[in-house]
Amino acid sequence: MKTVFAILFLTFIALTCARNYEDLKEKIKNEVEREIFEDLEEESDELENNFKKFNDAKPWTRWIRWKTIVPFIPAVIAAAGKK
């Protein structure tokens, strides 16, 4: 009789640990997903802020940027046209 109770007790402990393990695994998975989403939201906010800064530039600043890019356009077109 003692052996039966011992086996039942050990089985109960094993099932409890298995449930706890699955719960723990699920909690860890949810925590990691939540952290990933938070990081992505922060990066998205940073990108939006940088985009706003770029678009908020004064027109003459945009012209200066364009002026520095224009000389490279023929070289890019020539390189793209070669086979």
Swiss-Prot record:
Q: Give all Alanine amide modified positions.
A: 80
Taking the first listed entry, what is the main subcellular location of this protein, grouped into a coarse class?
Answer: secreted
Keyword annotations: Amidation, Antibiotic, Antimicrobial, Immunity, Innate immunity, Membrane, Secreted, Signal, Target cell membrane, Target membrane
Q: Which residues form the signal peptide?
A: 1-18
Please give the residues making up the propeptide in this record.
Answer: 19-57
Q: In which tissues is it expressed?
A: Expressed in entodermal epithelium along the body column.
Write down any Gene Ontology CC term. Answer: extracellular region
Name where it's found.
Answer: Secreted; Target cell membrane
Presence of keyword Ribonucleoprotein: no
Could you tell me what this protein does? Antimicrobial peptide with a broad-spectrum antimicrobial activity. Keeps its antibacterial activity under a wide range of salt concentrations that mimic physiological conditions of human blood, which is surprising, since Hydra is an obligate freshwater animal with nearly no salt tolerance. Does not affect red blood cells.
- Recorded family membership: Belongs to the arminin family.
Q: What is this protein called?
A: Arminin 3a
Native source organism of the sequence: Hydra vulgaris (Hydra)
